[in-house]
């Protein structure tokens, strides 16, 4: 599972444990509901300020939104950031 999809699953889990709808979380976190939907579906990666708003509103540890995410440099692509080809 890629980083965006894993984060999305974690966000859904935390939101449901808090008994919040996307709309309710949107208001509490000051993050547009469409962005929350895209994050949950793994269509985008959360910026650090968005991450802080989400874990603060959900009253969870930041690590709860990052469970299962392992980053190995060069092993995946995220959004518009792409691996660079080796020189030579």
Regions found by a protein language model. Give the residues of each.
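Short, charged recognition helix plus adjacent turn
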Residues: 56, 66-88
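DNA major-groove recognition helix of helix-turn-helix/homeodomain DNA-binding modules
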Residues: 30, 49-64
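A detector for short, charged/polar N-terminal pre-domain segments
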Residues: 1-6
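Ser/Thr-centric signal marking residues that sit
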Residues: 21, 34, 50
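Short basic helix-loop element that most often maps to the first helix and adjoining turn
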Residues: 9-28, 53, 79-81, 86-87
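Recognition helix of helix-turn-helix/homeodomain-like DNA-binding domains
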Residues: 30-45
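Conserved hydrophobic/aromatic packing and binding residues within compact polymer-binding modules
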Residues: 11, 25-26, 36-39, 65
């Amino acid at each position: 599972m890629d980083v965006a999809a894993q984060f999305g699953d974690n966000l859904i889990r935390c939101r449901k444990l808090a008994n919040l709808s996307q709309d309710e979380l949107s208001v509490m976190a000051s993050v547009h509901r469409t962005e929350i939907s895209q994050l949950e579906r793994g269509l985008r990666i959360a910026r650090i300020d968005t991450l802080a708003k989400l874990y603060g509103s959900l009253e969870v540890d930041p690590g709860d939104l990052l469970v299962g995410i392992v980053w190995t440099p060069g092993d995946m692509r995220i959004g518009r950031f792409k691996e660079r080809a080796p020189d030579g």
